[in-house]
Curated annotation (Swiss-Prot):
It catalyses: (S)-4-amino-5-oxopentanoate + tRNA(Glu) + NADP(+) = L-glutamyl-tRNA(Glu) + NADPH + H(+). Its EC number is 1.2.1.70. Belongs to the glutamyl-tRNA reductase family. Catalyzes the NADPH-dependent reduction of glutamyl-tRNA(Glu) to glutamate 1-semialdehyde (GSA). The gene is hemA. One of its GO terms (biological process) is protoporphyrinogen IX biosynthetic process from glutamate. This is Glutamyl-tRNA reductase. It is an enzyme of class 1 (oxidoreductase). It comes from Priestia megaterium (Bacillus megaterium). NADP(+) binds at residues 189-194. InterPro entries: 4pyrrol_synth_GluRdtase, 4pyrrol_synth_GluRdtase_dimer, 4pyrrol_synth_GluRdtase_N, GluRdtase_CS, GluRdtase_dimer_dom_sf, GluRdtase_N_sf, NAD(P)-bd_dom_sf, Shikm_DH/Glu-tRNA_Rdtase. During catalysis, the active site Cys acts as a nucleophile attacking the alpha-carbonyl group of tRNA-bound glutamate with the formation of a thioester intermediate between enzyme and glutamate, and the concomitant release of tRNA(Glu). The thioester intermediate is finally reduced by direct hydride transfer from NADPH, to form the product GSA. The keyword Oxidoreductase applies. Homodimer. Possesses an unusual extended V-shaped dimeric structure with each monomer consisting of three distinct domains arranged along a curved 'spinal' alpha-helix. The N-terminal catalytic domain specifically recognizes the glutamate moiety of the substrate. The second domain is the NADPH-binding domain, and the third C-terminal domain is responsible for dimerization.
Amino acid sequence: MHIIAVGLNFRTAPVEIREKLSFNEQELASAMKTLSGQKSILENIIVSTCNRTEIYAVVDQLHTGRYYVKAFLAEWFGIDKEEFSPYLTIYENDGAIEHLYRVACGLDSMVIGETQILGQVRSSFLLAQEEETIGTVFNQLFKQAVTLAKKAHHETEIGANAVSVSYAAVELAKKIFGDLSSKHVLILGAGKMGQLAVQNLYGSGAKKVTVVNRTFEKAQELANRFSGEAKPFADLQHALSEADILISSTGANDYVVTKQMMSEAERTRKGRPLFMVDIAVPRDLDPELDELETVFLYDIDDLNGIVESNLQERQKAADEIEIMLEAEIVAFKSWLGTLGVVPVISALRQKALTIQAETMKSIDRKLPDLSERERKVLNKHTKSIINQLLRDPIPHAKELAGEKHAEESLELFMKIFNIEQEVALQKEKEEQLHTSITSHSVAYQS
């Protein structure tokens, strides 16, 4: 048995390739069921987002596992393997375990430490449980991965510092004003940066946001999404007189707000300070605005310094999580090692119970006049003898499973107790159970 992770992500594949191998939510369950029916695949979970598509699988052999996962991707999406194979990354066993932990913790994300991926991993895990495409191994592995990720975010500051310019602008405003709920925020520009700024503002408690854009319809569209107010570009002068915070990201070729405009707005502001953040390149806000006593101006270079500092803080937290990862990998491998001993212990118990049952039958034949009470006493004591005899071998078998040469040690253990056949029967039952679960897999879809 082996664990593999096969997939591609924003680092290894351009968006033109990623979009061709992206599962939508509606087909994910069907895809996992289909993959379960393939040769070599014992368990599987698919994690598919805008930045990655990854298949995690428990396989009976590494080479056949890799082959059938690639074949599945090619047939499901109707793409030749040669088209996407150069972009694939394949992790095996320890590498696959570590990769999953890193993904769940946000260490492999475009924005290090982001938490959205944890929700996506958890959703795929719950779906796989519901569709019965996983068993003992992945139930434990993914449960451990989700728990580790939650612990990592709780015990470190991996997600505490802003690492996008628009978010840093809002964080800077919060540091200066504290509570944003009573502040009037003016957003210049309804593009991507403006949208992110509005989203982060509302997430930080801002309640009064006005959007100004050269195309009024775009300003309305953005404002309506967040119950804000839109104003035409012609009303910018009036909007400046009302605002406490200005975040600008129009990307215009000339300054959108000049020192002269702000000087005129100051006549009605009654000395109220205005916090200005320019996240546009080229700059929207005239640098001379900083000469005004009531204006506090920051540009994208100021914010980049904050972001860079925060990235360094996140990296420190990531280094702490890497140490956590090592301990979790050891713990999971230790648990995984005990799986090999389960059929051995079951077979040993079954053989002991069979001997006890045969002994009771022999007693019944030789002592047919025993009372029911006497028979119960004998049955109880013979079972007690069996349990006492197994008290030492079973813990030792578990210890053997965790050793470096576990397979050879367990083989010797089975020979000593003469239970090779019983163990083989136990494993056969497990395989039959897996076959019954996956036999109703659905047909391929493209």
